Amino acid sequence: MASNKYKSLNEKWDLYIPFIELGLQLLCTNGTFSMIVPYPLTNQKYGKKLRKIITEEYCLLEITDLNGTKVFENATVSNCIPFVQNCLPKEELRITHFFEGKTIQEVLRKSPETLKQDEKDYIWNLTREERTGTRFANMNVLGDFCYISKGMVLNANENVEKGAFKKEDLISDVYDKIHSRKYIEAKDIDKYQVKRVRYLEWNTERCPDKLSRPTFRELYDCSKLILNCLGTINVTIDKEEYFLHNHSIYCAVLWKDLKDINNKSISSSIKKFCRYNRIEMETLSGKVDLYYLLAILNSSIADELLADQRGGDYHIYPEHIRNLPIPLPEKEVQKNIGNIAKEILQRRKVNADYSDLQEELDKMVASLYQ
C-alpha cells in the first residue's frame, strides 16, 4: 500500500477501498465491475477520492441502494452495489432498490452531476431529495462551540492485557465500592431522557487505565450533551450526574468547560477539525447555552441538517455532529428556547406527552434558520 498504485486511499480508509480500485484497474475496455460494499462508500470522507474517480474516470451505470436491507446476517453496516463500466461517463445512471420478492427495480435516474451532493465532500445522494452540505455556510457549527468525542471502549487494551477482561466484566446493575460511577450506553437514552442507569467499575487497577480506549477522565466530570450514533438523532443533557459512557454515545462539551485541560486527544481534534484556535472557541462557547443546544439538536430541522451531512447513512459519525450549523441568536432568544427544553425534560421524567412543546420548539428553531 506504500506504493503509488492506489490513488483512492484517503484518511482512515477502509480495506474495501483499494479492492474496488484494483477491480477497476483490471477492467478491459467496456468491462464491468460490481461489488457488494458498505454503504459508507457513498458518503464518508475516506471514500471521497474513490467516488470522484468512479464518476469522473469511469461510467457509473447503476447503484443498488441496500440501505436498511439486511444482506449479511451478522453485519451492522448497510450496503450498496455500484456497477461500473470502463468507458467514458454517460449522461444518466440508474438508482435501484431491493423489494419484497427479492427483486431489484429501478426507482429513479440521475446524472453524475446531480448524484453529487456537493463539491466539497463529493457525497452521493441516492434519493430524490435535494440535499446540500453547504446550507447555512455562514453560520457557526457545533464544533466551534463544543468538543465532540466518543466514549470509552471498555475491553482490555490489546497491547497491554489483550483478552484479560471484556465490557460485561466491568458493569453492574447495582452500586458498590468498585462499581462506583453511573454508566449509560446509547440504548439507555432517548430524546431528553435517560431510561436506564447501571454502574461501572472505576478507579481500579484495570478501569480506566487498562481500557482499550480510556479517553480522558475530565471528559466525564463536566456538563455535556450526550447523543446516540445510529439512526435518528436522540440527545439529552447531563448537568449533574456526570455519567460515564461507552463508545456507542458521543458527548458534546462546551470548550470553556475544558479550559486548562490539555492532552493529545484535545490538541489532535483542534488540529484536524477546527477552524478557530482554542482560545477563540472557549470565548465562542461562552456565548451559547447548553439547554439551547439541546433544543436545537432535538428539533425537526436538525434531522434535515444531519441528512445533509451523512446522506442516507444510518450511522452518525462525529464529523456529522461537529459540522451541524448552529445559529447564534441573542441570549434572551436562547433562554426562551432553552426553557422549553427544560420543561420537556421535566415531562420526560414522568413520561408525560410533550408533543405540544416540541411543536412550539420546532417553530422557534426553524425561524432561526430562515
Per-segment meaning from a language model:
Residues 341, 354-369:
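Short amphipathic alpha-helical coiled-coil/interface segments
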Residues 11-12, 204-205, 347:
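Short, flexible loop segments at the rims of nucleotide/cofactor-binding pockets, characterized by
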Residues 1-167, 247-249, 261-263, 270-278, ...:
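Signature of N6-adenine DNA methyltransferases within the class I
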Residues 29, 42-43, 56, 60, ...:
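Short, well-ordered loop/turn and helix-capping segments at boundaries between secondary-structure elements
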